[in-house]
Structure formats: structure tokens, C-alpha cells
Amino acid sequence: MRVSSILSLATSLVSVVQAHTLFTTLYINDVKQGQGDGTCVRENTDLAHANSPVRDLSSDDMACGIGGTVPVNYTCPAPAGAKLTFEYRLNPSKAGQGFIDESHKGPVAVYAKRISSPSADAAGSGWFKLWGEGYDMEADKWATEKIIETNGLISIQIPTALPAGNYLFRPEVVAMHNVTPEVEPQFYIGCAQVFLESSVTGDLNVPSEKSVSIPGYLKKDDPSVIYNIYTDEEYAHPKKPYPMMGPEPFVPAAVSKAASGKVTRQSEGGIPDSCLLVNGNWCGVEVPSYKDDLQGCWNAVKNCWSQADACWAQQLASGGRNCEVWGGKCKDLDSHCSAKDFTGPPAYELKSDDYPAPGPIPAAFNAGDTPQDTSSSTEAPSTTKVVVISSVPVTVTVIPTPTPSTSASLEPIPDFTPRPTSTNTAQPSQTSKPKPHCGGRRRMRTR
């Protein structure tokens, strides 16, 4: 017996341009946050163009990317001085396929902004840079080329002197390959919602010359914006230095804390303990229990599939693999009800379908610039893992990472797990591809 009123899940066949990139995954102290990808990350919700760049310097999308003005459900806690790592992907839903096309050269930076709550507006004043790199003349490499070598992983250390509270951490990857007097760079931006747990409290005082408004921190005629990476002058010897975008990094002075300093902990926006499985910023909770109750059994099945429907509806560009995992639980419930087992819910092992990191997580790029806490006391530890409390066992299974290619093709590739079209979660074949979207023909560098 099955419930005829269970909603059918619509098919979503979308794809992205393989030359581009998207920030999909947050690590805190080398630990992936949540289950799957996208937890605590503001991603572009237009799945068909998820890794498309921001091109308008005056747009609010410059703050946290396209659609990034909308907060996500969860904020991840991080202890003072933690290392944050931002994973970028060519194909948002498939790890290990590269970072960005090698032709897309330019600077990389990480900004931060303290906010009053996770729902606060990202656009506007209060942004400051934690780290940035442009063109390394000695190594003859752009920052993007170095991040290709780290498999799209960008690591920074949170300065220990930053006061506790809600922050947006904003990685910024810029591609300069198509820049002309009429064409602006391509910005690949995202934001991670993080609550910094620390015994440092009070106001955050950033010098005016290092505090910027986003949008507004760049102008169309800035030397860093109109810089042409292909002209002979820039590749002459000696090479012409690249004028880095934005302000100089802000490094707060070291602080000294008393041994009894109280650590401010996160009180809102965390992942609830009732979550059995997480996909991005969706979580599944246990269905209502029932005992010797036929209708209660089928109501539980309906509840489960309703949650699966919500999972697919809320899937991010980083995919819906755990929506498929949750569907397995629903099918198991269905089979128990069909077998007239009307007491439950039955135990079911949920295995998060996680990709491992695409390579070794690099050390913080700004580690040498960040002063350490001078106190001898040890701050109380803060967890950065999601702890799931449930009567149903939950384990994590790591699936193998595809071998990254040495150079990325410019052909568009299918992206995202399609939604199942019925309650048996069968997946349709992928039948469409998008047109390439890269802002014009690639110019060859001249010497």
C-alpha cells in the first residue's frame, strides 16, 4: 500500500559552465561543516547559472555573490584563532574536477564583516580584508594559479583579537582574462556565515582606510580593475607590478585575556540537535512515532516524503546527494508499512554522501601576519563539528574523489543530482546542456 497524495518531485536538470567556479564548502580547522556541501554558505540559488560571475561593480551581488544578500538557515561556530578554508569548484556539485579554468587569471582575497545577526544585510559598510594576493612577479604566477595548485582550497586564520560575534567571511576570486576598457573583471564571490566564539568582547574598531563598503570599494577606472594581463608591458622585464584591489589587510593587535575570561558561545543559528541528516542548509528530522497504527504508519511515510520534497526544493548548487539519501529512509518506511509493520519508525542507518576534500588542506595563507594571543590561559574549546543526537544511528561515508584533470575543458557539463520524479526516487536521464557563458572570446597573451 502506498499513499497516493505523496507529492511528486519535479525534475531539475541544470548545468553550469566548466570554466567558471563557485565557493561551495566551508571547513573550520580542517573539518567540513555540516554534511554534504553548502552548510552555512550563501550560494547562488539560480542553479542553472550557479557559477556565473558578478560583473557589475555597483551591484549588491558584489557583497556575497549572486543571491547572497539572502541569509541561509545555519551559522557555523568557530573558536578564536581558527583556520577557515573555502573550497571552490569548477562544477559545484562534483568535487575533485578542478578550481577554475587556467586561462582565468587574477587576484584572490578574503574579506570579513561583523554583523549584528545572521539575517543582517551583507551589502554596505563594515568590510575589511584579512588577506589578499595578486601577481607574484618573482614566481610569475597569479594568485588564481596558486589556488589551482591547492585544488581550489583557500585557507586563512581568523585573527585572535577579533571580538566574538556573527561574521560573514567572503572569499573573492577575480578573473582578469577578458578585461578591456569596456569589460570589467569577473568576480566569483560567496560568503560563509560564522559565529566567532571568543573571550574577546566589545567593539571592532577598523581604521577608516582599511574599512570599505561593498559594493563601492572598487571603481571602473581603478588601475587594479582595468589592468590588462596580456599586454607586452606587463610581461616585460622587469615586470609591471599589479596594483592589488581593495584596501590593505587589517590585522588587529594582539590581546591579552585574563585566565578567567568567559568565552561567548553561539546562541542562535546553529544546526539543531534534532537533525538526522543535513543537505546544505536543510535538515531532516525524525518522523512522528506510531504503535499498532496503520494510519500513523502511512502518515509517517507521507511526512518523510514531504521532508524529501523540501530537501530537493532547497538544494543548493552544491547538489542534493543527501536528499537522495533521505529518500532511502522514506522507501524503507514505505516497505515496513506495506509489510504491515505498523509500529515505528524503524531504525534506519543514514549515511551522509560526503565528498572528501579535493586535496590536502593548505595552511593559512595569512598565518605569518596574524598576531597570537599573549595570554597564558587556554580558551575553552569550541566544537566545529555538527553533533547529531538521535535514536537512529547516523554515520558518514566518504566516497572517492574523482581524479582532477590537469587542465579544464571549456565544454559545459551536466551539474546537480536530478530530483526523482516519483516516490521511488528513480532519476531521469540528463538531456540538456547550457550554452557556454564566459563573456566573450579568450584573448591570447602577447609577448
What name fits each language-model region?
Residues 153, 166, 189:
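Short, well-structured alpha-helical interface segments that form or flank functional binding sites
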Residues 80, 163-164:
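Surface-exposed loops/turns
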Residues 2-6, 13-108, 116-150, 183-186, ...:
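Peripheral, solvent-exposed domain-edge segments
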